[in-house]
Curated annotation (Swiss-Prot):
Residues 496-509, 774-784 have a biased composition (Basic residues). This is Mitochondrial distribution and morphology protein 34. Residues 97-127, 157-221, 263-289, 357-377, 473-588, 627-663, 718-823 are annotated as: Disordered. It is a multi-pass membrane protein. Residues 110-121 have a biased composition (Pro residues). InterPro entries: Mdm34 (IPR027536), SMP_LBD (IPR031468). Keywords: Lipid transport, Lipid-binding, Membrane, Mitochondrion, Mitochondrion outer membrane, Transmembrane, Transmembrane beta strand, Transport. Residues 546-561 have a biased composition (Polar residues). Lacks alpha-helical transmembrane segments, suggesting that it resides in the membrane via beta-sheet conformations similar to those predicted for other outer membrane proteins and porin. It comes from Coprinopsis cinerea (strain Okayama-7 / 130 / ATCC MYA-4618 / FGSC 9003) (Inky cap fungus). Residues 738-748, 798-807 have a biased composition (Basic and acidic residues).
Amino acid sequence: MLAAKQPLVVPMHLRLSHFRLSSYVVLVVSKQKGITIVFKTDPLQNVDINSTFDSIAVIQSFIQREIEGQLRQMFREDLPSIIHRLSQQWVKAKVETPYKKQNQDSLQKAPPPTPTEPVPRPLGISRSRSAGHALETMSTPDLSAPQFDRRRTAASDIHGPAFLRPPLATAPRRPQSTTGISVAGRGSPLSAPPITHPTNSSTSTITSTSTAAEPSTFPDLEHFDPTYGLRPEGLPTKPVFKGFSKLFAPNKGLADLAEEISSQSSSVADGDSDYLSSGSATDEEEYERNSYDFVEWGSTTGPNTTPPEPVVEYETIPAIGGGTITRPRVVHAQSQIQLPPGVSPVASSPSRNVATVLSRTGSGSNGSRSGAVTPGILSRNPSNPYFADRLAALPHIYRPQNISSGPLSAPPIASSSRRPFSLAGGYDGHEDVKMKQRASYAYSVHEEAVYMQHTGGAVNRYPHPYDLERHRYQSESKYDDEDIEDYSDEEDNGRGPHHYHPRAHRTRHEAHDDYFTSRHPSASVPPSSPPRSSARPPSTIKRRLSVSSNTTNRTSFSASSAYKHHHPNHSSLSLDPSSSISNHPGNDKAKIVLRPSLLNNSIHHLSTLSHSNHTLSPYTRSFEHFAVRSGPPRGSGAASAVVKSGSGSGIPTPSTSGAGGGSGMAGGGIGLASGSGGGSLGRAKGLTTTAGIVGLGAATSRLGKTKADVVPKARRKRVFRIGGKKPEDNSNAAPGETDTRNVSREEYGADEIGEGYVEGLGHASGRAGSQMGKRPRPRHRKKPSYAASGTDFDEADMDRYFKSMHDAEEEATPVPRSKDRRP
């Protein structure tokens, strides 16, 4: 593709010739509808297109195909529409003139009635009976016009201003439909209704009976569609398509529904009230009310009985690059992110946390959002299988007092001031019973107390299992530093830290009491164990953050203003785990840290899916029987081999892995140790060496070989040895030297290693550890595998076959091939 700096203009001559059209056409000519033409078959039979680029066959065929296709579409769709619209413009000038003259003649002949004179009854009857041939006094109604134009509000309003009255005597009326959908016809589609004088309204209806006997149109022919038969009677026939203009209006979301309902209900209510307020109904009003025209259905219905639309909730999410995005909140059908109003979360979902339910009871002293449940909290774990608590039988005082179903932009900060006590301020004995009925996941009261104290009493009632593990590690770890500041004086003065860490050996009941004492120092229940002065405040503990700490860390809400309002001795709590501000009252300038994931619950949930079993489904298995262990990664090579050897004197001496130490390197992390002077796998001459093998792939290890030489080989029973010669004497080989040739009588592999380890422990030469296994075949060798399986296949022979081929290629001089059958 070429990028031109300026537009490239290519002159081209194009000529269309040899047009040939042939088709069956249905042609309908009407004074009212104009000319309608429909092609039943493809009209274009042939067209020749010549251009400047006819010499290029590809371009010529492309131009021919494209232009011919466009012409066929034009004849089928565009040409009938063009002809129809042009004919309507011509019919409009011809049709409106006679009716205009009729109206003027009727005005001259008939005297105008008095304004208070009602329309006589026989006239209405004659109009209804002769509706098939009478002239309609109302033109084609526009769908976009208000619907109150078709109604009369009072008897005196019949002769009101002309702009409130519909235009009269512009088109003939269609016959009454047998389907019952419509009884009113449509006038000329493009004819502009003439504005008449107010006195024309009554006189034109009088003259309609005199001209009824002279039909000037043929409705059955005019309303016949040659393609689909009779046209729909209730649809407008104007070609301007005003009825479809609302389809192209800008989308306002759910606001469109509310505006439509309000406008429709208001217009219906106004129309009905105006109609009922009138003292009497005229014949025209009764006729218009009883008719079933397409545009009158909305005005004849009763008041709006549909339920109101629910209030649109909006959520605010942080935008990329700064700022926020406010959008309508979408709650899916199978999502429990937000409970419906009036439904208790305890009854709807039994798997709720005790701390959550207890925290939703208000303190009773403030009328603020004490019991509000923000959707952010409910969406943490709507039906969390990790914490399957059975809370259906909770006392009534622990039920939430008021549940808020506000949007996500509701302030969740004040929720931390909720007190897990009854409204009377006392302590209920049922609480300890319910606290001990924890089920499924090992998320005990002790762990809850530890977690709540580490997070500074935050509102995060659904902690992630990773957070629990991390806080459990912190609470059970030993405090190595001894010069920690003593907080006993501050505790005696009444301003000490209320959050201390219970030890791992404390009972659940003690941790439970400490939890409530630490959360609410004003409680009358004393703790069962005294506070320890050596307890470390949460900020002084060094957190061990894992790789997934940034993604799996739960966002905690900060309790600053509301909590400080009820507890002046408490300072603001910084809930950022990486914050250096402590939570003890000595620091009054603790900051509030809110993370961006606080408002975006979907991304917050998705960030925790670090494993395959972490899903958003409520049917996921719990972590009850899972054991997660972490350790350093083990690679393949000498660095990952753990080898220790002990000499006879009892002093452990680490050996070296590799050829320099005389031991072979095995693939998959196998290290073989050799003592001073060398030795076999488990025993050496003069020294007793114990070699430890740690790693993988011990069955495929080769002594004295590198990684490339320890690939397992298949074996065969009978092999023709290529370039074979007698093995050389390896008695003079230096320690660590390895002969890689003439392996016809040497054994490598798992069976030989097992042989040397079990049967031939004393067969090694002792010169080097790498020569273990490189020995003459022992007298008692294992039976080949084919003997047990009953097949003719021996893996050892096939290994020797491929090894001998490799050795033959390495020979500098060609060796004549000899076929010696191995016994």
